[in-house]
């Protein structure tokens, strides 16, 4: 009898699930106004779940897997807090202090992750940042091999205590909307520094494009051959070497210590390694799929500005369309063009992966609907990939939203290339978004225009504003021009074309030369991967051998194997 009773007591925990919702359905959340907002979670299989909010109600039935989903009308924007009640039988969840307004998703890499407290000049603004109806949900940095249903985090209102840890770009974007619209604004921030666009895209979507499918295939091959024991042994060897180096560095000058190596990272499975294709989508994007919102803002690209990358005007639309398909909503999507970086260039015709990616960002505007781009080639820092000015990027993103989503009559972008015409030894370039007229920022002649003939030799050009929206470009060195570029460099110092709102013109080119995203020789990549794996095996063997007596047979056997592997390793070295 006791045994039967004990088993019966276990039944609820084995067969029934407690009513629950993801972490982002929590106190202080903001629901998208004037929509049927999706609410979902888990309950007992077959349970009837009801959702009530501000006199409205909705219901859903949990499936065999316990999952349920309901949609509830939110009504107009409302800064008065209300309670969202979810119930199933005797179980009840009360989510307090819920507002109704506009909700946006903020993602990308380090410049989106960059927090307010990293810019000293914002200290005064932070001290005055009491905005009870401006709220942010900050997602933690996590990885996952498979799509996740939940992620930790809490909603926080804007106060001097919370804002220091808010994404600066997202804060200035939300603050601009909040002040202009006078309604609650919520932002869900989910970003991770130093990561490429492919990691924020699902592997299913990546598999539809040849270039990105190759990245997924390479990762899965790496995953299949991953040996945790070998990886751990290699890490232990690296860690021991690092510890030895650090111990030897004690007492050295500060300048010498700057050159010391960083501590090696612990080994991770490829499918759990941040930055790998689809990994951050699974962990940090997928949990939010379906949250009812207006759109997304994006600041990323640094991790893709390199030779060999799949062109960004393919990968960014791939991600945008992937998100829209999963949300079943054509979300507005506004992104920040990369800022200036590196030493200023002084020679025309430079092949530059940074400028090429900036221009590919511009091209996305013409291929992907409901997108916008904040141009920031006037706020960069030659010595820091993280410009401290995050106010301009955030507020320029807000201009796109205020105009295209909220009906404000604004000039919402800097000048964007529209067309070019060659005539009488010169090229006339026409721009969109000129406002009431194009201008020079500093009042001097326009700079950073380049021109070339069929020989593909570039020269600095003379550029003159001609009318409200055109620039006349020519050079005495080029009698028969065929192509023109503007601001074509990672740091086009002196670029000074703006519109009547003071917003800078975007980089552009009319040619398709010097495509630095060269086709990758996959055989070279394969050889490099095999050599890397061989190197790890050698390090692991060396670490194992170091634990043995030099006179032992085991030591001698490992030495022989080590010699053989080293010979093979040297054979695979790249030919000079």
Name each region found by the language model.
Residues 1-4:
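Positively charged n-region of N-terminal signal peptides that target proteins for export
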Residues 8-9:
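Hydrophobic alpha-helical transmembrane segments of integral membrane proteins
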Residues 18-566, 570, 575-576:
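Cell-envelope and extracellular/periplasmic
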